[in-house]
């Protein structure tokens, strides 16, 4: 399960709970945080294969988290999916600049998120294998 570790970051506990159930039922190990600062610490210590983060959170926003992740050697290449209630808030340019692997607007389906995670991890595995 070492290649199926997901860090979920959201201050809405019910979203974390629903997503965690879906991922665990599909063989993923789930760790979670309710703000960007805690998530950064977990990303460094737990080394998730992918991070799913909310855009708008207290303490440190999702964008601030991604900026910090990209500056740190251990986390600079970790794929990130951004969840947002404001799909217009993240431009294509920002996504490319910060290497955000995907964005989903709330409300989203846990199945849709799972498919995104699996696609991103599969593509990443193909890149590593080649």
Describe each PLM feature range.
Residues 17-25:
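Charged docking surfaces used in two-component/phosphorelay signaling
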Residues 27-34, 42:
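Short hydrophobic/Thr-rich beta-strand motif most characteristic of the beta2 strand and flanking loop
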Residues 33-37, 110:
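Conserved Asp/Asn-Gly motif in the active-site loop of CheY-like receiver
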Residues 46-52:
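Active-site beta3 strand of CheY-like receiver
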Residues 57:
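Receiver (REC) domain active-site loop signature in two-component systems and cognate sites
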Residues 108-118, 125:
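C-terminal output helix
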